[in-house]
Amino acid sequence: MEDDVLFRELFSKIEELPVIDCHEHILGPKREVTRREPIASLIQGYVQSDLLSAGITQKELDILNNNEIETEEKWELFEKFWKKIEFTAYARVTRLIMKDIYGEEEISLQSILRVRDKIILPTEENYNSLFEKAHIEVI
């Protein structure tokens, strides 16, 4: 019981610590795409390695990355591979983005469609607010 209390207390303090991130893949507002289809947005970064490991072909991955293809058209393909990777460390980042930034507890077609209208536009203010929320100091 005491260990539980100590853990929660320590964890809450650790969450408040600022982070210095010297290895980032965020492009910044001047280089980011302004219109982003939600599946294409959510699979950016290392999660694509998991998709490839799960057997997605490059052609299928190109479909998921295509901003011009509507979410509903690519959902079946995404869902097929998401089920294979959803518990990997990289997919955890995707789940955290959905939960912490967009308020969605699950990844489903309905939740992704709701996110479509909430995709954060790449402005300086939006980028800075994400860093503040994560306690990452931008220098």
Model regions and ranges:
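Metal-cofactor-binding active-site regions of metalloenzymes
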Residues: E2-I139
